């Protein structure tokens, strides 16, 4: 029986490349001359720390980072940015978290959405991914289109497509 897995993963190497590209752009931009502004990627906690001298500049840096992530194939919705910007001494910073895996509430929404579609497929939650199986390849492709079209707050990838 054909099946596939729905996952939400961020390639950390591509994220590192995007952070490096954003750092290079900040070094060459005129509005960031003589300003302490930086990006730091922490592989262990999967966070990106954005640091600058004012809250306005932190927001500009986040826009640059989102653009560079998008160029590297990582959607902006995979970056979880908290609302509050922390002020410490003379610097402002924010720690944006890269979303890895699908949360259980989102998993339940996806499974409910698949079951409500009345397609002849089964969806099973397996850890932080969802396995979808069905008899028809067309039904599985319809599920893929439905998950892509649904506004669930994070990007999804499909892997392990088997016949």
Curated annotation (Swiss-Prot):
Pfam families from the UniProt entry: DUF520
GO cellular component, one term: cytosol
SUPFAM superfamilies recorded: YajQ-like
Gene Ontology biological-process annotations: DNA damage response; response to hydrogen peroxide
InterPro entries hit by this protein: DUF520, UPF0234-like_C, UPF0234_N, YajQ-like_sf
UniProt-recorded Gene Ontology molecular function terms: ATP binding; GTP binding; nucleotide binding; tRNA binding
Highest taxon in the source lineage: Bacteria
CDD domains: YajQ_like
Signal peptide feature range: none
Keyword vocabulary terms for this entry: ATP-binding, GTP-binding, Nucleotide-binding
Family label: Belongs to the YajQ family.
Subunit structure: Monomer.
Function field: Nucleotide-binding protein. Binds ATP, GTP and tRNA.
Domain notes: Composed of two domains, each centered on a beta-sheet, connected by two helical segments.
UniProt cross-references to NCBIfam families, sorted A to Z: PRK05412.1 (NF003819)
PANTHER family: UPF0234 PROTEIN YAJQ
Protein name from the UniProt record: Nucleotide-binding protein YajQ
Source organism per UniProt: Escherichia coli (strain K12)
Gene label: yajQ
């Amino acid at each position: 029986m054909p099946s596939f897995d729905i996952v939400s993963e961020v390639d950390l190497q591509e994220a590192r490349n995007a952070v490096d590209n954003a750092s290079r752009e900040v070094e060459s931009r005129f509005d960031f001359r003589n300003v302490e502004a930086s990006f730091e990627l922490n592989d262990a906690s999967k966070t990106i720390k954005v640091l600058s001298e004012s809250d306005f500049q932190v927001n500009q840096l986040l826009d640059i980072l989102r653009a560079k992530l998008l160029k590297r194939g990582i959607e902006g919705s995979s970056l979880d940015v908290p609302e509050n910007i922390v002020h410490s001494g003379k610097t402002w910073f924010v720690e944006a978290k890269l979303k890895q895996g699908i949360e259980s509430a989102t998993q339940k929404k996806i499974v409910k959405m698949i079951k409500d579609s009345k397609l002849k497929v089964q969806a099973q939650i397996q850890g932080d991914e969802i396995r979808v199986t069905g008899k028809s390849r067309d039904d599985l492709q319809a599920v893929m289109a439905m998950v892509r079209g649904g506004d669930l707050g994070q990007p999804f990838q499909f892997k392990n497509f088997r016949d």
